[in-house]
Structures are given as structure tokens and as C-alpha cells.
Amino acid sequence: MNRETVSVNIKTLPPGPNARKWSEFHRRYAARSTYHEGFVWDRSKPAIGPFCTDVDGNVILDFVSHVASSALGYNHPELVRMASKLQAVDPDRYAGCDFIGAWGEDPEKMEIPTPSHLHYKLMELTSQFGFGSAFFSNSGAEAVENAMKICYDHKQNYGYGICFYGAFHGRTLGALSLNRSKKIQRDWFPQIPNIVDFPYCTCRDHPCQC
């Protein structure tokens, strides 16, 4: 892929057969959320500037621009040169909670695991709980917020939340109610009711002497 001459090239109208294969593989254990199934980015294929390649070989113009966080595009020569000089990992950040990222054409024959494969691994590790799907969040605060929503949905807005002294769970509004690290983090903000805090048990004795 040449930075100066590359252009959009659609070989197979998306979603092509490989994209459908990856989408089906991904949907098995991924909770339905904002994933866009029409485009499956093949991260083993060339990407340069604002162009990237999907699993069916289509060269796509990326209007997302890394969600506006990296407008220089993919594989900027100066960034690649500096990363190589520092022996650093190639700069790579994509919206893994929004796009299905593939590595190769077949999810069953991948060289590098993807977020889709992590869903399968999570189901394996938590099989004793009977979960049917996994949901990835962009940050710890988002994970806490979604966990709180699941609890409220299960209890139908009834019950208590528990946190520990010194806890920090994030700066989003719901997570602030669980923070006990600094008082200023909760001042003047509305609080979710029925949050109870406890000292964290550090006792090594059995039975516990806390």
C-alpha cells in the first residue's frame, strides 16, 4: 500500500463472506451493543494514512479517524520511525468496543487473538456462573456504571450498594457515589442512595478477626 497513491478499492460489497464469518463468530458470546458488523477490520492487512483493509480485501477510507484521537492516521512514517528507534510497540489504538477487529480471514485460524477471542476466553473462565455473553467497556468507570445498571435491573431499583473505605471507582456520576478516597470527589454531586461503606478486611487470620 503506497501512501501517495492508495485509494478506496471495493472488491466485494461489504459485508463479504469473510466479514460475515467473523461477525457470526463474534456474536456468539459478545453482548449486543454498538458493534458494527458490516465492516470487519483485518489488522493483519495494510493500513496507511486514513485507509485500512477489511477481511475481504476491500480498502476502506476511515472516517472515524481513531475516534478523533489520532488524526495523523495509520503508520505515520515519523511515528513509526520514533517507535522503532525507542524499540516500542507500534502505536495502535482502535475502538475495540465498536468495531470488530480481525487478524486474518478466518477466526478459527488466527495468528493473534482478537477481542472476539477474548469473549470466548471469558466464557471459559466464568463457565461456572452460566453467563451467556460478555460486554467490554472503554474504562473502569464505564465498567462500574454498567455493573451498577445490571444490579439495579436485577433488583428492580431496590437494595444497597457496598463499597470500601479508600475506594476509587471513577469520575463518572454514578461511580462517584462509590468513591471513598477523597471527599472532594463527591462534594456537590447528587448521590445514588443506599450506598454503604465498610473497612476493607486485610486480616490474614482464620477465622477473620476484623
What is the meaning of each model-derived region?
Residues 1-37:
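Short, compositionally biased leader-like segments
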Residues 41-64:
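Active-site and channel-lining beta-strand-loop segments
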Residues 36-40, 184:
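Short, P/G- and charge-enriched loop/turn segments at secondary-structure junctions
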Residues 53, 73, 175-179:
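Short beta-strand-to-turn element immediately C-terminal to the catalytic PLP-Schiff-base lysine
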Residues 119-210:
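PLP-dependent aspartate aminotransferase-fold enzymes
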Residues 5-11, 16, 59-156:
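Glycine-rich loop-to-alpha-helix module at the N-terminal edge of alpha/beta enzyme cores
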Residues 34-37, 45-48, 130:
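Short, basic and Ser/Thr-rich N-terminal targeting/leader segments
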